[in-house]
């Protein structure tokens, strides 16, 4: 838990965030005086990329070693998914979900209710034994769907591990985003693990990245980036000739490439997530 006392460098894509009065998380350079919870990795990035100064209020630290087994597991799953994607095997989506659960399960919030299904014959007896914990019930056909309050007293998670995973994933993005800004390369949109930038600058950024970090930016391995557009029939580079961004995870790219005969082909890359239905 820290209090930010100084921000030395403002960024187009700020690293730290605060919650507004309405509960919306806002990434901002205007965080002087803000009190926030932060882990070691995110704090190092805030110092390195935005030159922040801070006061430590309180916190936890671990000094008895570090279990890195997850590194081997994620490497195995990544290699397996890469192989399945090459074979166009839809099972790769299952591996993707398993990989996502590496952090999702560690920061799982308490599950406050559970749904129990009972037949008409079982319903009255179940209610009589569990009435103190019944939140609601609804009859569907010949069965009852009962929402039961679940005790959270036994709930636990590994939030300190999940935070570390998320912060390392953000560092991968932070290294690229801040380097692009420092080299006056335009990043038009950023998501969790991707970004939109000018096609002619795609070759410039990797060179600067290798010079600074002594690693390859472009490739198909973990922590590397590559052009990720898909267009049926494309035999050349795929790029967007026009894009419209409405909000986070709400955008469309007009894609263009050439087919095997050299003819220009086009298609759409559309994302529309987190839009309320009412």
Residue ranges and their predicted role:
Residues 1-278:
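Conserved acidic
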